[in-house]
Every structure is written in C-alpha cells, then in structure tokens.
C-alpha cells in the first residue's frame, strides 16, 4: 500500500548538511491499495501487469468524534477514500467536482509514481539511472501532475538536489497530445491546486520560475519578439491558473501528436511557440489498433478467411495482410468476402433486436458512428443528415434510394449539456 497526502501545509527546516528539508504537515491521507491484472501477450511467453488502485482510509471510524456528537468527522476519512474511487472523471462543472477530479488524478498518480520508484530501487542501486529503465508516457494532460510528483519523490524521499531530480524527470516523462481543443488542455485554479497539493504546487512554481527565466534569456535580445506575450502563452502558471499542457511540454523529452496533420497543426499553430523553442521534442505517432483485438478476436470469420488466403503471419506482422491485394479482382474472393460481411451483419441485427427491440434489415447499408459524443465529433451533423434524408423520402417517395440503417453509439460527459441534448435528439 502507498500513502497519498492531501492538503495541509509545508514546513521547511535545514538539516545537519545545510540542506533544506520540506515536510508536509496537517494533511489528510488516503491509503492506496494495489490490485494487479495480468495482461497476457499473444503467443510470446510474456505476461505484463496492469496495476490499478483502490482507496482506503488510513484511519477508519473515529469513535471519539462520534461519542462527542461530531458524526461527520467520525466518518470523514472513510468518505474521503470512498469518494475518490466511486466515479471516474466526475462532473467538474462545479467547484466540488473540480476538487474531486484533482484528488482523483493525484491519488492514482502519486501511488503509481511511488510504486515505480520503489520497484526500480528494489532491483537497482543508482536512482540517477532511473530514466534508463522507466518512462512515464503522459496520455493527455490528466496525468501531468506526475512530473511534479516524481520531482517530489526524488527530492524529498531520496534527497536529490533540484538539478539531479530535474535531469531524471525530463528524461523520464513524455507527453501525448490527443486534441487541439483548448478545453482539453487542462487548467487548474491556483487556489484549488495549492490548497489541495501544497508541496506539489511549490515544485510547479519553481519549474515555472526557471522556465520563465529561460524564455527571457532566449528571447530578450531577439528583434520583433514580444517576450511578455511569449510568457503569457508559454508559462505554466499564469492568470491564476496552472496550465498542465505547458508543464508537460516543458518537463519532458518528447511531445507527440496522434496523426500527421494533427502534429503539423500542433507545430505550426497551437503549440508553435513551444515548437520554436524545443523543435527536437516534437514528433508524430499515428494512432492505430491491434489486429489481434479488432480482427482476430472481434471478427473470427474474416480472420479465418484472411489466414486461408495469406497464412497467419499477419497476426503478429500486420503488413503481411497487404498480400491480399492479389485477390482484389478475384470474383470468388470478392463473393466470399461479401458473404462474411453479410453473416456479421445478420449477427449484429440479431443483437440489436435482442437488446434494443429494433428490427433492422441486414441487407441495408450499415452507417455506423461509434465514438464519444462531442460537438467536434459531429454526431449532430450526422443526425441532421438522417433527418434530411427522411424528409426527402417523405416528399419524394419515388426516389431510387438504397436502404440504409444508421447506428449511433456514444456516451456524453456528465456535465456536457449539448452532448446530452444530441443523444436526446438521436433517440
């Protein structure tokens, strides 16, 4: 188990070596309990581990508080722990939701970072080489506080200097940006962040202070450059907010987009200032899927057909599937392929009838949009198109129109009203 601390304040004293020692005091603590799931590799003899965390109170029911009539305080620790893991990504349209979401993020991150460092030290002697064995891939901005948490662990628990901890951290952390939408580039109010994570905020302040100095040194004598505008766009702490995307870029060795065009937009528009300062950090990693999950497992009829024509090497070496090109004009292969497609549509039609009570024609075109519901994903545009087609057919029943079944699958964030209304419209 790991102990995760929230709130309180940070005291500073000097040890016998003249080093400043930072201690978090007056905090609330939660115990993180690990649960491991085996992730079995495909025919390679490798089993990886997915570790998840449950939250438990450090102190359970406080009888003294209960006997004094303070019933809320008696169960305070239990409620704190339970709330953290009750609902992932709670509605953050209000202050309490924002606070719970930040607690949630830090809880999982702190437990995981502590475990990663301890696990490394069980097998290695030199913490300075941590980055040679460990990488923290920050999947969007939600886990970015891991940067400051790793700095905290290295400095406060392993007594490294700032410079030593910073070198390790910047060689350990890498950031994946998934979207250019400003709303997804997470920001936290300073008041909330500093109150909930006082030691972490101190570290973020120092990262920001040093980075702002770097900006000033780099651009102060460059003609035509507005240094204050650079700071406004690039600072980690600015205008009362902690900007997590900025911290992820400043504090890691890699920043990647998930499609070629997306990465180009990051470099030339959205993160242009950072790209100019750190061009070597930016790269592209195009999103993809695994053929073992989405073909071999999900579509066994088609998988068997592919194997019958090109062998089974494609299961572990996807480019081998390109050998199907020679069958592109083969009438027999085309018919086999279409038969498999039809059988799968019949299977889906049965599922829809069983679970939704709707009868669909498997001979119709299945027009499918399954992804999280968001205005930029354009489900609204899609359903408006459906409504337009319906009206056209009502007005012109003589139109030559091939039957089409529209299938939507999505969920909306709890506080996202427009997305909820779009679901209502589709229904």
Region roles according to the model:
Residues 1-427:
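A conserved ligand/cofactor-binding region detector
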């Amino acid at each position: 188990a790991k102990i995760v601390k929230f709130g309180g304040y940070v005291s500073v004293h000097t040890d016998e070596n003249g080093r400043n020692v930072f201690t978090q005091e007056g905090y609330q603590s939660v115990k993180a309990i690990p649960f491991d799931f085996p992730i079995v590799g495909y025919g390679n003899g490798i089993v990886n581990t997915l570790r998840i965390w449950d939250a438990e109170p450090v102190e359970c029911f406080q009888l003294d508080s209960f006997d004094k009539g303070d019933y809320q305080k008696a169960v305070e620790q239990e409620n704190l722990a339970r709330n953290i893991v009750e609902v992932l990504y709670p509605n953050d349209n209000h202050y309490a939701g924002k606070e719970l979401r930040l607690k949630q993020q830090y809880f999982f991150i702190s437990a995981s970072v502590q475990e990663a460092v301890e696990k490394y030290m069980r097998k290695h002697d030199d913490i300075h080489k941590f980055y040679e064995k460990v990488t923290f891939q920050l999947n969007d901005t939600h886990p970015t506080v891991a940067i400051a948490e790793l700095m905290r662990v290295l400095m406060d628990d392993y007594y490294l200097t700032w410079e030593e901890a910073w070198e390790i951290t910047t060689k350990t952390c890498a950031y994946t940006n998934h979207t250019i939408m400003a709303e997804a580039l997470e920001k936290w109010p300073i008041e909330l962040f500093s109150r909930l994570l006082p030691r972490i905020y101190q570290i973020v302040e120092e990262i920001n202070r040093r980075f702002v100095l770097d900006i000033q040194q780099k651009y102060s004598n460059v003609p035509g450059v507005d240094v204050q505008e650079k700071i406004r766009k690039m600072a980690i702490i600015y205008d009362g907010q902690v900007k997590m995307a900025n911290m992820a870029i400043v504090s890691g060795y890699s920043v990647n987009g998930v499609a070629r065009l997306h990465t180009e937009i990051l470099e030339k528009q959205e993160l242009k200032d950072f790209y100019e300062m750190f061009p070597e950090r930016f790269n592209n990693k195009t999103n993809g899927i695994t053929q073992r999950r989405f073909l071999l497992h999900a579509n066994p009829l088609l998988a068997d057909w592919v194997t019958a024509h090109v062998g089974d090497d494609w299961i572990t070496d996807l480019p081998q599937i390109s050998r199907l090109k020679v069958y592109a004009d083969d009438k027999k292969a085309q018919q086999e392929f279409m038969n498999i497609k039809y059988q799968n549509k019949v299977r889906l039609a049965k599922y829809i009838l069983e679970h939704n009570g709707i009868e669909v024609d498997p001979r119709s075109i299945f027009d499918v949009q399954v992804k999280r519901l968001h205005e930029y994903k354009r489900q609204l545009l899609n359903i408006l198109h459906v409504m337009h087609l319906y009206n056209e057919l009502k007005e012109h029943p003589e139109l030559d129109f091939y039957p089409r079944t529209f299938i939507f699958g999505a969920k909306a964030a709890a506080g996202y009203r427009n997305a909820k209304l779009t679901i209502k419209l589709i229904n």
